């Protein structure tokens, strides 16, 4: 039995006192985020308000069900918070209905599959090698095991979506659902064209806007809501909120199916502390300043791509219309894995990534994916990202000449410049 002293420590001790092992490692991770340039396209830096909401006492509350229809008592205030999150999400994207409960973008996608498909049904998504996502039909993913996925790709000559190819495979295979969106496609997607193709065969159109959601909210990328039957997204990445998922639609019949798929179909109790953080992030994204942020993310990405091209580094499709780009390292004779590791030693974090028509194993890859959301959040503009592009070029060109074991001098030089740059743009001080 806990004594009064035990209780006082339980409710009063901070993390540094209660668990030094975890506290120390969080501190080291904070230092990494402060000192390194985050170029992973799916990562961002959230506000203190988002952190406070997610770390709040709402983590104590179980709330199975939906606002006003819970299976537990004591939900008065979490009902209000979840309702605020729903209304803000609807306003942010111009949607009639929203479900803010999915724990992740993957679970949001799974909810749509459960709502609209039966096991064994055919759906059409972008090939993973062309820039799609695991949940769009990879054989390693549930979506590729429970359903019959077919894929479309990009044109070899320009690495842009082959809309004629999409239409051709749709007419031939008659999928029940078509997915537009991906995790490594840098160009603007023609959602109206996808809807036209879906309507021609009586299919649902689902848009996975996880990577572009913040740009869409800020008016810097086309909004799929007027075109899609249903839209899924994460709430982090460019949207700059906590890690989680969101489903949007203008169709009342579809949202009823999705709500049932999320709970009780896939999840039990929602994470109300995360939903509160989502609400805070949606509120931030509704502010006029977020439009400036979204535009700056795209401007920075274009500056980064241009600097890389001038450094002799190849960009898939020749540039970007969004926050991300794929670097094709095959002309340099460098692997994505080696580039990722070398850049990290130079204090620039990215991820190895396959490129269209890549023949390298997925654990090695022939490319890297780069993004500008986190750097833009900490205050970088075009001048800073131009310099970042030049520094990446130095590391990659050094790898091409020196190999991964001989690039230490280049990495050390670049690391000093990175530290000077991040020192000018501090976070969480």
UniProtKB/Swiss-Prot annotation:
Recorded catalytic activity of this chain's protein: (6R)-5,10-methylene-5,6,7,8-tetrahydrofolate + glycine + H2O = (6S)-5,6,7,8-tetrahydrofolate + L-serine
PROSITE patterns xref list: SHMT
Alphabetic keyword roster: Amino-acid biosynthesis, Cytoplasm, One-carbon metabolism, Pyridoxal phosphate, Transferase
Chain positions found as N6-(pyridoxal phosphate)lysine: 237
A molecular function GO annotation: pyridoxal phosphate binding
Residues flagged as site, Plays an important role in substrate specificity: 236
Principal subcellular localisation of the protein: cytoplasm
GO cellular component terms listed in the entry, alphabetical order: cytosol
Gene Ontology biological-process entries: glycine biosynthetic process from serine; tetrahydrofolate interconversion
EC number(s) reported in the record: 2.1.2.1
Domain of life: Bacteria
Pathway it works in: One-carbon metabolism; tetrahydrofolate interconversion; Amino-acid biosynthesis; glycine biosynthesis; glycine from L-serine: step 1/1
Coiled coil regions in record: none
Cofactor(s) required, per the database record: pyridoxal 5'-phosphate
Pfam families in alphabetical order: SHMT (PF00464)
UniProt xrefs under Gene3D superfamilies: Aspartate Aminotransferase, domain 1, Type I PLP-dependent aspartate aminotransferase-like (Major domain)
Subcellular location field: Cytoplasm
Chain positions recorded as (6S)-5,6,7,8-tetrahydrofolate binding sites: 128, 132-134
Family membership noted in the UniProt record: Belongs to the SHMT family.
Function: Catalyzes the reversible interconversion of serine and glycine with tetrahydrofolate (THF) serving as the one-carbon carrier. This reaction serves as the major source of one-carbon groups required for the biosynthesis of purines, thymidylate, methionine, and other important biomolecules. Also exhibits THF-independent aldolase activity toward beta-hydroxyamino acids, producing glycine and aldehydes, via a retro-aldol mechanism.
Quaternary structure and partners: Homodimer.
Protein name: Serine hydroxymethyltransferase
Organism, as annotated: Caulobacter vibrioides (strain ATCC 19089 / CIP 103742 / CB 15)
